[in-house]
């Protein structure tokens, strides 16, 4: 919805906000008007934070979690069990598990799910690096925490077969309703799903 | 909700998004992760749009609508009836009326409502400029389109008394439910409210 009554710099800004996920035209307008009301220093800080996060945040060399250093804070944390790896599709899933405060191991973020429909094969995901990581160090258990869907199940089975020769592979329990997004599941359900994980090999 | 697992530039960016109206911690996280996935050029454009809108968008000298020039596009538009002024509290209310596509006159944005509880007196609003504008030029009618609330009614009565010597003053009909925000009322209701306006003097 473009209105002739917006002045150009404002309509441009609203256009940017409309591209964000879950932001409709009215929310975009509200956010843009909010920006105009802020002191200039706040907007400069925000603008710098955007560029800084975008250029400085990369992937952990070990687990592919987001980090601004070589290794992420979870991989560097000696309090966490480095022999227990939880495999997730995306960083947002890792953050959801962290909110559940149930898991004390480390992660491996594969970057998506195998999906022939979207031409996403295993070679596009961080699966080879996972196999390498597991084969090179002593790992007690791999927990697969992927969304319960056709793609999630396919990916779980694929990784399960590859890792079976090296270590124990489990999958978090089907406590999650089918088709739901891991990101939005409540903490208690996620904790239950971790507890009730079942053996795959 | 601050998580130790966010890397600093990311948590800083999330913090900025959390300050936006109507954006909670999870939406802020989703928006920040979305930013990281965008190409750098998009983020540079967005960052520039923020600064440009903030520094270039000011107030119209005539009606105090947002504009990047001296006079806003509505005031400069010769197709619009310059003798019919609609008084609104905020720019977002003006935009809501524009969406209703019912009003063909011009506006005066007073910048808020009289509210003794919040120490907002008439002198903090663009009411003096409105009286001056009405007294200096030939105006057929002033339509007051303020939120139906104690503050809105007070402001309407105050402006109504001040302008009565100069011209006809009307108020949009009470078709709006009490306590609602003008910004969120649907277009049809707004159009009805404009049609059914009543005489104040």
Swiss-Prot record, chains A, B:
One of its GO terms (biological process) is DNA repair. PROSITE patterns: RECR, TOPRIM. Residues 83-177 form the Toprim domain. Pfam families: RecR_C, RecR_HhH, RecR_ZnF, Toprim_4. A zinc finger (C4-type) spans 60-75. Belongs to the RecR family. CDD domains: TOPRIM_recR. It comes from Prochlorococcus marinus (strain MIT 9215). The lineage of its organism: Bacteria, Bacillati, Cyanobacteriota, Cyanophyceae, Synechococcales. This is Recombination protein RecR. The gene is recR. May play a role in DNA repair. It seems to be involved in an RecBC-independent recombinational process of DNA repair. It may act with RecF and RecO. NCBIfam families: recR. Keywords: DNA damage, DNA recombination, DNA repair, Metal-binding, Zinc, Zinc-finger. GO terms for molecular function: DNA binding; zinc ion binding. Coiled coil: none annotated.
């Amino acid at each position: 919805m473009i209105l002739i009554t917006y002045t150009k710099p404002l309509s441009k800004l609203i256009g940017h906000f409309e591209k964000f996920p879950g932001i409709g035209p009215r929310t975009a307008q509200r956010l843009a008007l909010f920006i105009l009301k802020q002191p200039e220093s706040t907007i400069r800080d925000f603008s710098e934070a955007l560029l800084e996060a975008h250029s400085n945040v990369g992937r952990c060399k070990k687990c592919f979690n987001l980090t601004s250093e070589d290794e992420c804070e979870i991989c560097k944390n000696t309090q966490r069990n480095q022999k227990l790896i939880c495999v997730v599709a995306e960083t947002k899933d890792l953050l959801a598990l962290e909110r559940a405060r149930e898991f004390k191991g480390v992660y491996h973020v594969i970057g998506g799910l195998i999906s022939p429909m979207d031409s996403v094969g295993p070679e596009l995901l961080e699966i080879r690096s996972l196999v390498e990581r597991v084969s090179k160090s002593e790992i007690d258990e791999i927990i697969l925490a992927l969304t319960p869907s056709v793609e999630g199940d396919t990916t779980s089975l694929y990784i399960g077969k590859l890792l079976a020769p090296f270590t124990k592979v489990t999958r978090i329990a089907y406590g999650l309703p089918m088709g739901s997004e891991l990101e939005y599941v409540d903490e208690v359900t996620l904790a239950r799903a971790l507890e009730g994980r079942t053996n795959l090999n």
